[in-house]
Amino acid sequence: MELNDIHEAFQSKLRLMILSALISGGKSFKELKSITEATDGNLSVQITKLEEWGFVTTTKSFILKKPQTIINITEKGTIQFKEYVLLLNKVLADT
């Protein structure tokens, strides 16, 4: 990955926060909201974009009769995130 090849997913602070949180494992929508301090609407829009790009998946279920959405990073998302981190490290090492 080169600087000119950075995916749009990494050009948003909120999307970066979401992917950073998910790299350690799946999170509920509520957990991501707490971590990112984003509004429901903004978080939902960014998760949808990441899902459309194949970076995350969402699973809806019921826990004690309450709906819950779990978001997981995909293999593609993990690879892209790690490549992005490597690129940042390279840029920092070159300065």
Where are these predicted regions, by residue range?
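A cross-family signal for key residues in well-ordered alpha-helices
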Residues: 17-20, 51, 82, 89
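Amphipathic alpha-helical dimerization/coiled-coil segments
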Residues: 2, 78-95
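Beta-hairpin "wing" of winged helix-turn-helix
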Residues: 51-67
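Basic, amphipathic "hinge/linker" alpha-helix immediately C-terminal to the N-terminal HTH DNA-binding motif
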Residues: 62-83
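Residues within the DNA-recognition helix of helix-turn-helix
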Residues: 46
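N-terminal helix-turn-helix DNA-binding core of bacterial DNA-binding proteins
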Residues: 2-42, 64, 68-70
